[in-house]
Amino acid sequence: MNIYIRTIFFAPFICLLIFSSNHGLFQKKDNQNCNSHKFCLNCSGSYLKNSRWLSETSVSYSDEGEPLKYGANDNNYDSNLLKSEEQKQEISEHMKMLIKLYIDSSHDSAKEEKLFQQVKKYFKNNEYKDFMRTFIKVIKIHNDLTHLKKQMASTEKRYRIISCVAAFLSTVSLAFTVVMLSTLNLKNENVIVTIILGLLGFIISLPVISYILSPYLNSSLEKGYRIADLYSEKILRQILHFQ
């Protein structure tokens, strides 16, 4: 009889202990999932900074684009009164603001930090999850295109320098060959020297070929620029019209 009484007495404490341990485990897993979201914002490979995840509250924006929080007791805002189409339009407007903030934050650290915070908020909201997955993928593609255009610009700059140097060396070598041939007597003993100087001038003048072909190479580089710009604009235009 004493055993049954002790079992009944200690059973609630054992159940409470098991429940508290499981609750702590689930909370730890949720925190790990929250901290696992990160994406590359620019070509240098910067990531989302770790910070506290905000609670799931309804979010709206003022005219300046600043986020406004609405509590459950606020009479000016009631999410239950919004229709599905109005909610969809609101999501679309928020996403357009987010894209515009991303485009404008390339050289502004303050706007970049603001973008970090906004992205973290939307990751927590179920209504925005599908868009955020697409948004992150598009950002990565857009960054790759930007990095490609920078590489093309660097290649074009090096090519133009090499072309100018080649043209200068070609002009000097041709002038040197003409002067040397004009000062030599066309006798039998000087024929070998003349041939050697002529071959030397021809070899040095080979960069003229690259100078002649430079318009075609420039056309290829410009075509690559146009392709990169076209895809970059197409990506931004598609995501701006996300519904």
From Swiss-Prot:
The modification O-acetylserine is found at S55. The P.falciparum Export Element (PEXEL) motif, also known as the vacuolar transport signal (VTS), is a pentameric sequence (RxLxE/Q/D) required for the translocation of proteins across the parasitophorous vacuole membrane. In the endoplasmic reticulum, the motif is cleaved after the leucine residue and the N-terminus is N-acetylated. It is found in: Host cell membrane; Host cytoplasmic vesicle membrane. One of its GO terms (biological process) is cell-cell adhesion. By binding to host chemokine CX3CL1, mediates the cytoadherence of host erythrocytes infected with parasite mature forms (late trophozoite and schizont) to endothelial cells, which sequesters them away from the circulation and thus prevents their elimination by the host spleen. The chain crosses the membrane at residues 161-181, 192-212. Potential vaccine candidate as CBP1-based peptides or antibodies against CBP1 prevents adhesion of infected erythrocytes to endothelial cells. Monomer. May form homodimers or homotrimers. Interacts with MAHRP1. Interacts (via extracellular domain) with human chemokine CX3CL1; the interaction mediates the adhesion of infected erythrocytes with endothelial cells. GO terms for cellular component: host cell cytoplasm; host cell cytoplasmic vesicle membrane; host cell plasma membrane; Maurer's cleft; membrane. It comes from the Eukaryota. Residues 182-191 are extracellular. Residues 1-24 form the signal peptide. This is CX3CL1-binding protein 1. The record marks L54, S55 as: Cleavage. Residues 25-160, 213-243 are cytoplasmic. The gene is CBP1. The keyword Zinc-finger does not apply. The keyword Acetylation applies. Residues 52-56 are annotated as: PEXEL motif.
